[in-house]
Amino acid sequence: MQKHGTNEGALWGGRFSGGPSEAMFALSVSTHFDWVLAPYDVLASKAHARVLNKAKLLSDSDLETMLGGLDKLGKAVASGEFKPLPTDEDVHGAMERGLIDIVGPEVGGRLRAGRSRNDQVATLFRMWVRDAVRSVALQVTELVDALAYQATQHPRAIMPGKTHSQAAQPVLLAHQLLAHAQPLLRDIDRIRDLDKRLAISPYGSGALAGSSLHLDPEAIAQELGFDSACDNSIDGTSSRDFAAETAYVLAQIAIDMSRLAEEIIYWCTPEYGYVTLSDAWSTGSSIMPQKKNPDVAELTRGKTGRLIGNLSGLLATLKAQPLAYNRDLQEDKEPIVDSFAQLNLLLPAMTGLVSTLTFHEDRLLSLAPAGFTLATDLAEWMVRQGVPFREAHEASGACVRIAESRGVGLDELTDDELASVDVRLTPEVRTVLTVEGAVASRATRGGTAGVRVEEQRSRVESTSQSFKEWALTPVRK
C-alpha cells in the first residue's frame, strides 16, 4: 500500500504537522459502523466523476480510468476483499485510499474536487436508508400475510374481546388478528411517506456553501435515484431529521409487534390456553422440564425498548446543534444501523411464530361469554324495542348483578328474573344472548361480523401486496 498524504486513511492533514494522538483517533474512527455505506460511496463517486468530466475538470481518459477503478473497488468491497484498515478514519477515507491504490494518486486524487465529507455522508446515509427501509417494509408485509393467513384458517372462531384487560364483547379471532395487521400496514405507509423526504439529495452542497466548480447536483441526484437535489446547501449537509424520522418509524414497527407479542405471551399460558407454540419458535428451561417459553415474543418485547432508546438517544444528539455540520452528527448512524439490525432479527422470527401458532377454537369459544360479555347485546336489544339507552344500560347492569350473585351467565337467568329487572325484558331477549348472535349483529364497516371481517381480510391482503410491489421496486435503475 502506498502512502498518499500527511494523515493516511483520512481526508485531511495538510495543515497539520502530524497525525492525531492515539486516543483522538480512537474517538474519531467510525469504520466499525459506517462501512455499510461503502457500496453507496462507489455509486456516488461514479456519478461525481461524471459531473467532474462534464465540467471539464476530469478528462475523458481519466474518467474512464476512474470508473474502471471504482468498478474494481466496488467488486472488492462486495466480496470482502477490500476492508477498512485500522488506520482508516472513516468509510470515505478508506474508499479513497482503495481507489488510489488501484488508479494511482494522479487520477484518484482528482475525485475529491467539489465534494466534502459533509455532503457525501448526508447523501450516502440517505441512499442506504432508502434501501434498508424497503427491506424492512417487505418483511413487515410477510408478517401481515402471516396474520391474514391465520385469519383465513379460523374464519368463524369466536374469542373474548377485551378492554382494560377485562372481558368486554365477543369478537372473531380473525378480527383480532387483522387488528394487529392494520397498524403494521400503516407503518409501511409511513415508510413510503418518509421516502419522499429521503429522496432529496444533498450531493453538491460541499461543506455547507455549495461549490464554485460549476458542478451539476441535479444530474447526480437523478443518477442516484433521488427525486431532486436539495434547495439549501446548509440544510442539506446539517439536517438529520430524516434520521430521526427513520428511527421513529422503526421504533413504531417494533412497538406494534410488541403489542402482538404481549398478547401471544398471555395467550399461550395455561390460564388462557388460547394457543400452543410451535417447537421451532419456542425454547425450554434449564431446570424445569415442562417449560415451553415464548422467547420470540419476549425478545420482541425486550428489543422494542432498545429501538425506543435509539430514537430517544438520536433526538437528544440532534437537539441544539448550530448550523451547519457538526461532528456530533457522526452519532446519527449507529442507532439507525442498530435499529435496522434488530428488526431484521425480529421480523422473520415473529412471522415464523405467528404463522405456526395453533389456536384452540373450543377454548376460545368457551371463554367468549365469560365476564358477561353479552351485557351490551341485552341493552341494545332493549334499545331496538324503543327503550332509552340510559334505562337499558341500567337494566342490563342489574341483570349482570343478579347473574353474578347466582354464578350463572346472562342467558341462564329465568324469565321471572329478567322481568323483575324490567318488564320490557321479555323472553324474546334470549335471541341475542348467544356469542354467535352477538358477533353476527355487529355488521357495520369494520365490525366483527363475519362478512365485515372477510372484507377486512381482503383489503389487508390487497394492501399488503401493493406495498410488497413498492418495496421490491429498486430505487435506482
From Swiss-Prot:
One of its GO terms (cellular component) is cytosol. Its main location: cytoplasm. Keywords: Amino-acid biosynthesis, Arginine biosynthesis, Cytoplasm, Lyase. Coiled coil: none annotated. GO terms for molecular function: argininosuccinate lyase activity. Pathway: Amino-acid biosynthesis; L-arginine biosynthesis; L-arginine from L-ornithine and carbamoyl phosphate: step 3/3. It catalyses: 2-(N(omega)-L-arginino)succinate = fumarate + L-arginine. PROSITE patterns: FUMARATE_LYASES (PS00163). It is found in: Cytoplasm. CDD domains: Argininosuccinate_lyase. Pfam families: ASL_C2, Lyase_1. It is an enzyme of class 4 (lyase). The keyword Lyase applies. Its EC number is 4.3.2.1. It comes from the Bacteria. SUPFAM superfamilies: L-aspartase-like. GO terms for biological process: arginine biosynthetic process via ornithine; L-arginine biosynthetic process. Belongs to the lyase 1 family. Argininosuccinate lyase subfamily. This is Argininosuccinate lyase.
